[in-house]
Regions:
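Basic, often amphipathic N-terminal segments
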Residues: 1-68, 84-146, 151, 163-176
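Short, basic/glycine-rich phosphate-binding loops at helix/coil junctions
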Residues: 72-81
């Protein structure tokens, strides 16, 4: 699977990475780079050139979004503990336009994940993360995140290589 990401900028990226790394270590789960998934790229990567052209000319980046909540819920292994962010007009326009350009599926609500419920070693989903445990982790994360807004930019195309759940195989293949 291939997707387009926006990344937090500067200090925010460093703080979120430290938080993700620490909670992954504490919970025996995989660590990953902080990002907001703009959309998937479902087919031919030739559309990435058109996406890059849009990014260059749109004038929307970086986008500043408000944090609305830090949530823990059993949704998918990739949406277990996450920062919900405001779907501002700028973010919505950016995501929808890129979705149209690359032919992606309908978008899910914008968020920045903090914990995936994938085992650190096997990368298999961990059934021991119930709603209560995820809510407790989310509350701890919320206590450590002072920022009320996040600045997102530096778009890139990420490729999952060996499959979506092969988090260690994820690689940035192109900056937009």
């Amino acid at each position: 699977m291939t997707s387009i990401w926006l990344r937090p900028e500067g200090r925010q990226e460093q703080q979120l990475q430290a938080l993700i790394d620490r909670f992954a270590e504490e919970n025996g789960t995989v660590a990953f780079a902080p990002h907001l998934t703009v959309c998937g790229v479902p087919g031919d990567l030739g559309v990435v050139d058109a996406a890059a052209a849009y990014v260059r000319q749109c004038g929307l980046l970086p986008i500043r979004v408000a944090k609305t909540a830090v949530t823990g819920a059993v949704i998918t292994p990739f949406r277990a503990v996450f920062i919900e962010v405001e779907n501002s007009a700028e973010l919505r326009e950016f995501r929808e336009r890129l979705r149209e350009i690359v032919g992606a599926r309908q978008l899910i609500p914008p968020h920045i994940s903090l914990l995936y419920t994938l085992d650190r070693d096997t990368q298999a989903p961990r059934p021991d993360f119930d709603a209560e445990r995820l809510q407790e982790i989310a509350a701890r994360c919320a206590d450590e995140i002072d920022d009320t807004h996040f600045t997102l930019g530096r778009p890139l195309v990420n490729n999952a290589g060996g499959g979506e759940s092969n988090v260690r195989g994820w690689r940035a293949i192109r900056e937009l």
